[in-house]
Amino acid sequence: MAHTVSLVAPRRQTRPVQVGSVQVGGDAPISVQSMTNTDTRDLPATLAQIHAIAQAGADLVRVSCPDMASAEAVKALVAQAPVPLIADIHFDHRLALKALACGIHCLRINPGNIGSTARVQEVVAAARERCVPIRIGVNAGSLEKQLLEKYGEPCAEAMVESALHHIHILEDLNYPEIKVSLKASDVGMTVMAYRQLASKVNYPLHLGITEAGGMRSGSVKSAIGLGLLLAEGIGDTLRVSLSADPVEEIKVGFDILKSLGLRSLGVNIIACPTCARQEFKVIDVVAELERRLAHIREPVTLSIIGCVVNGPGEAKETMVGVVGGQGENLLYQHGQTIGKRGDAELVETVVEQVEAIAQQMRAAKEKAEAE
């Protein structure tokens, strides 16, 4: 197996916070999260989506609490959720207090928009009592009026100034359990804002491109923006914001981390884009394998190459490999040929091989943890 060349800078050192059972920042793995888009008051629908997001590999899930009934629903959600939950709160400090009382693991608020200093103090006191961190979420689309007047339009400098203002509110109350996000729909503005803030504070940073768009365009924008920052060692948790099923956000988030060698979840399929030389239907096989192997969490590498031009070389670098060969496709395992399979048997054989390797990896991990 060849060694992967890393372009990623050393991770920025941040002050860790604890979101339920998940550490964010410090030396913890970069966590991946998403947000439900159901009516939070609809417990069956919201719980079903939380479980689906968690099943996809999410470390954290955020729920919106726009009213008191939604905040009250947090109690039942926390009791049945398989991962820690974050409450998204705006304007009304009573919603934050209710979510805290119901056991939420983290708050996403802007201290400056939930009322007077006394109200902020009340929320911080309740968060401190429960050791619940607060994410300051700055968004280019909702910057303070005075900042828009000062800078003329949303910009990285205005976002950083807003973040520092909210950070200072919590610091003045001696509450350092903070993480911060600075999101814009513009990739360049977002990257510049995170770079600037990263040079000024050591709080964990939640990365994201807000309102990134649909599945294709949003994934590309997020991969570029988040990828740039992660490669510079900036970022402790991330959300890929898509106008799509939240489960897809988790998949794309892990794909970004996987591409940078920062964190792997599931099977990494390397496949050719196909041409006239393909000896089997690569696109159909890859689509079927993605579906059949979606349940696997172990970082198994798999190459699916349609011909002998690049196939053998790729197969030698992956745990399982397939090289097209006129109806008799070569199979590889750990760089060695192990036989041939016809097109009809190909998918089933590869699934069996990958599942067997994943099981070996699980067993080895369990043994190591038990020792």
UniProtKB/Swiss-Prot annotation:
- What general EC class does the enzyme of this chain belong to? oxidoreductase
Q: Does the keyword Iron apply?
A: yes
Pathway(s) the chain acts in: Isoprenoid biosynthesis; isopentenyl diphosphate biosynthesis via DXP pathway; isopentenyl diphosphate from 1-deoxy-D-xylulose 5-phosphate: step 5/6
Pfam families membership: GcpE
Q: What's in the keyword line of the UniProt record?
A: 4Fe-4S, Iron, Iron-sulfur, Isoprene biosynthesis, Metal-binding, Oxidoreductase
Query: So what EC number does this one have?
Result: 1.17.7.3
**UniProt xrefs under InterPro entries:** Dihydropteroate_synth-like_sf, IspG_bac, IspG_bac-typ, NO2/SO3_Rdtase_4Fe4S_sf
Task: Name the cofactor(s) required for activity, per the record.
Answer: [4Fe-4S] cluster
Entry cofactor note text? Binds 1 [4Fe-4S] cluster.
Residues annotated for [4Fe-4S] cluster binding in this entry: 272, 275, 307, 314
Q: Name one GO biological process term.
A: isopentenyl diphosphate biosynthetic process, methylerythritol 4-phosphate pathway
Q: What is this enzyme's catalytic activity, as reactions?
A: (2E)-4-hydroxy-3-methylbut-2-enyl diphosphate + oxidized [flavodoxin] + H2O + 2 H(+) = 2-C-methyl-D-erythritol 2,4-cyclic diphosphate + reduced [flavodoxin]
The residue ranges crossing the membrane are: none
| MF term (GO), any | iron ion binding
Q: Which HAMAP family match?
A: IspG (MF_00159)
Q: Which family does it belong to?
A: Belongs to the IspG family.
| Name of the protein this chain belongs to | 4-hydroxy-3-methylbut-2-en-1-yl diphosphate synthase (flavodoxin)
Which species does this protein come from?
Magnetococcus marinus (strain ATCC BAA-1437 / JCM 17883 / MC-1)
Q: What is the lineage of its organism?
A: Bacteria, Pseudomonadati, Pseudomonadota, Alphaproteobacteria, Magnetococcales
